[in-house]
């Protein structure tokens, strides 16, 4: 699925064993066609790019937490995993992790879905 980035990037939808997992990295928001295509059936897991804490302006190439949570709200997955986490988001989460919705977690090396 096409994503929004300064270079062509694609997301992936994995379907099998009764589960739907979307893997969407290197994007800032979602193109309308991609969003609509993903909305055709519920997602079990959404793995989504989120590189920065909330920003005062719209970021370029990668989601900040505001945009990531907006995508999660639109897609309504059972669970969401934020990935492509930058140092500034990691530092922000030390003091604000409780501000994440209950179905949102932070990905890490070795994370299993």
Task: Cite the ranges covered by each PLM segment.
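Core dinuclear metal-dependent hydrolase active-site scaffold
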Residues: 1-33, 109-113
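Cap/insert and terminal regions of metallo-dependent hydrolase folds
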Residues: 29-112
């Amino acid at each position: 699925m096409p994503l929004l980035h300064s270079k062509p990037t694609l997301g992936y939808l994995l379907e099998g064993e009764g589960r739907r997992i979307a893997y969407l990295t290197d994007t800032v928001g979602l193109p309308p066609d991609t969003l609509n295509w993903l909305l055709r059936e519920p997602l079990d897991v959404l793995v989504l790019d989120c590189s920065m804490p909330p920003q005062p302006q719209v970021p370029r190439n990668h989601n900040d937490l505001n945009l990531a949570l907006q995508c999660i709200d639109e897609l309504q997955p059972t669970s969401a995993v934020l990935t492509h986490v930058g140092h500034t988001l990691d530092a922000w989460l030390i003091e604000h992790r409780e501000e994440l919705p209950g179905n949102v977690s932070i990905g890490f090396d070795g994370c299993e879905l």
